[in-house]
Amino acid sequence: MKIMFICTGNTCRSPMAEALCRKILKEQNKTDIRCGSAGLSAMDGEPVSDNAAAACAEVGLDISRHRAYTLSSMEAETADVFFAMTPSHGYVLRRAGVPQEKIHVASPEIPDPFGGDLATYRACRDALETAIRAYLEEL
């Protein structure tokens, strides 16, 4: 199974989610699930935000080498689940032809921390971890 974490720019929420998911999967010894991340409006090649990297580093995750990536049609066909940060992301995915049954929208939605201070990114990181753990328990 492949889970793609989807946000807007792929510089904050989705790369944080990807790293957190990998950490959780490792903790749970789940080897049958892969994860990735992409943005719906990413500027390909942009680095993660400094505060996203710092918030992840605080919990032992290094996302500093991540570069933004726009969701491709190939991934849209090969991913099993699209974990959307907000209902708006889910809507865009549906409009792009992704079947509804492949879309999981975070509940509650994960607000965009872009431009916020480190505390905002910490709150985002913690909300992501809670949402990802809850989702993985459903599988």
Residue ranges and their predicted role:
Residues M1-E77, L139:
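Conserved active-site segments centered on acidic
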Residues P15, T86-P87:
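Alpha-helix N-cap/helix-start capping motif
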